[in-house]
Amino acid sequence: MDDRKFTLNFGPQHPAAHGVLRMILDLDGEIVTRVDSHIGLLHRGTEKLLEYKTYLQGMPYFDRLDYCAPMNQEHAWCLAIEKLLGVEVPRRASIIRVMYSEIGRIMSHLLNVGTGVMDVGALTPITWCFEEREKLCVFYERASGSRMHAAYFRPGGVHQDLPQRLIDDIATWCDQFPGKLDQIEGLVTENRIFKQRNVDIGVVDQRTILDWGFSGVMVRGSGLAWDLRRSQPYECYSELDFKVPVGRHGDNYDRYVCRMDEMRESVKIILQCIDLMAKDGPGPVLLAGSKLSPPRRADMKNSMEALIHHFKLYTEGFHVPEGECYAAVEAPKGEFGVYLVADGTNRPYRAKIRAPGYPHLQAMDYLCKGHQLADVSAVLGTLDIVFGEIDR
């Protein structure tokens, strides 16, 4: 019997597990020879629950998938419904959606960078990341009433318009945020210990990306400039000017650098959205005069038909024509997609959710084999997985 070979249980309560992940690691001394990921500990049957809810009632379930950036998931659900209905959202609503999707991207990347750096021993950056993330949570709350589970997007637009004061505060935050990123990068990016722990660790080449079905930063970190916002533009992304940051080596370090650069690009997109809203002026944020949107409060006080419409919208919901479609968004963690099958009723026949973290976690065995035990948490951190969406 070789006493150098043994099996180790990692998680599901481990602080570096980023949720309820259990991994069974086979080790040869300090070297990892096999990783067996056990998932399902956060399974809530979301896809089945959606079949029993109206399209509007299904919306809050998407906030609870990737709860690090909730509105990005709502976006995919709305796009799928709108695709089947054949409707186009008002321009101002489209701009607000893009702006809050980018706020969600920064929220997710701040959390990932802060915890990922902490996993390899740096304790200061996470406090700076959370300080900035807290301000973004306040912007979520001021738009929707909730810091986390917003349920702000709607099929046909967004729930309500943003007050001008909130837009001004977002612009002010965007002006100071790049300085905070410089502060984090000054401590981390060229740090000798951080580079030793991440350079040439968890390398993926372009062939592996295609084989495993990776998306998001996992693709761009290896040099492929694949971003749905650029390659398959939705909403008003085709009008916006932004770069797609890419890495060269496909290792942990390149993925960290890509996320830092993406936050800078997201700030540029948010500022462009604010300029577009200022140029276009006030406008509707929800499809007016359709079965998708509730009537105005003033109309409900004077019209019995408006009151009935309001009641039926929130009890029975609206009917979606029979058909099927796939709608995807470039979420912070990769391509988040919804394959929606409608049977002509007020509830979906089937909704299949494509979680970007699922194929990434499958590759843990490939990524960690031959590395040391201490590198497992570093690799896991740069995958940026969240179990709300993986277990569903």
Swiss-Prot record:
This is NADH-quinone oxidoreductase subunit D. The gene is nuoD. Keywords: Cell inner membrane, Cell membrane, Membrane, NAD, Quinone, Translocase, Transport, Ubiquinone. Signal peptide: none annotated. Belongs to the complex I 49 kDa subunit family. The keyword Metal-binding does not apply. NDH-1 shuttles electrons from NADH, via FMN and iron-sulfur (Fe-S) centers, to quinones in the respiratory chain. The immediate electron acceptor for the enzyme in this species is believed to be ubiquinone. Couples the redox reaction to proton translocation (for every two electrons transferred, four hydrogen ions are translocated across the cytoplasmic membrane), and thus conserves the redox energy in a proton gradient. NDH-1 is composed of 14 different subunits. Subunits NuoB, C, D, E, F, and G constitute the peripheral sector of the complex.
